[in-house]
Regions:
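Intrinsically disordered or low-complexity boundary/linker segments at protein termini
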Residues: 1-73, 156-165
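Short, small-residue-enriched loops and turns at beta-alpha junctions
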Residues: 6-7, 78-83, 110-113, 139-140
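Conserved phosphate-coordination/catalytic loops
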Residues: 10, 50-51, 86, 113, ...
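Charged helix-capping and loop-helix junction motifs
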Residues: 12-16, 86-90, 119-121, 145-150
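Short, well-ordered secondary-structure micro-motifs
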Residues: 40-41, 56, 81-86, 116-118, ...
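Redox- and metal-dependent alpha/beta enzyme cores, enriched for Fe-S-associated oxidoreductases
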Residues: 49-101, 106
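Structural beta-alpha unit
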Residues: 98-131, 136-144, 159
Length: 165
């Protein structure tokens, strides 16, 4: 997890961004508090119908196949501008089924709180010891500007997060 404060804070965020965006590999971020006693037994998938989410789920298959419980959450946006980013949760459900991953897939309307905070809350409620998600950047802006959920997860994660781009 990047440093939140101090002279290295900006550098840490820049490095985290570059690693996810440019490595071509999944990246496992571990929170300041470290990983818990387990890793990958209870996995929450933050699903958005995008290349990044699909890549993250595919990259996480070794964890997903061995998990005791998997919960995929597809958050449906409230505002009309975001509707084009949302497609049915059936894509992730079908993929997981084809790979013999027993998962519960929930579609939820975006709550009034930020999506990242909502996902962290659901992860805590579920007892997740790993979150799987796509790493996003905002198109045509500085590579240092991450999407809101990706950035919030890096800053506030309470369990390890596997990100892919």
């Amino acid at each position: 997890q990047p440093m939140r404060k101090g002279p290295d804070a900006a550098f840490s965020t820049e490095v985290a961004n570059a690693v996810v965006m440019d490595s071509g590999r999944p990246v496992l971020f571990v929170p300041y508090i470290g990983a818990g006693k387990t890793l990958g037994e209870r996995i929450l998938i933050a699903w958005k119908d995008s290349r990044e989410s699909a890549r993250a789920v595919a990259d996480a298959l070794p964890f997903l196949k061995d998990a005791k419980a998997v919960l995929a959450i597809a958050v449906e946006p409230r505002d009309e501008e975001s509707v084009q980013d949302y497609v049915s949760d059936k894509a992730v459900e079908g993929f997981l089924r084809r790979h013999d991953v027993d998962a519960t897939v929930n579609r939820m309307v975006a709550p009034d709180i930020a999506s990242g905070e909502f996902l962290l809350s659901r992860a805590a409620d579920f007892g997740a010891d790993l979150i799987v998600m796509g790493g996003y950047s905002r198109p045509r802006l500085s590579r240092l500007v991450w999407g809101g959920v990706s950035n919030l997860m890096l800053e506030s994660m309470t369990v390890p997060v596997l990100m892919s781009h």
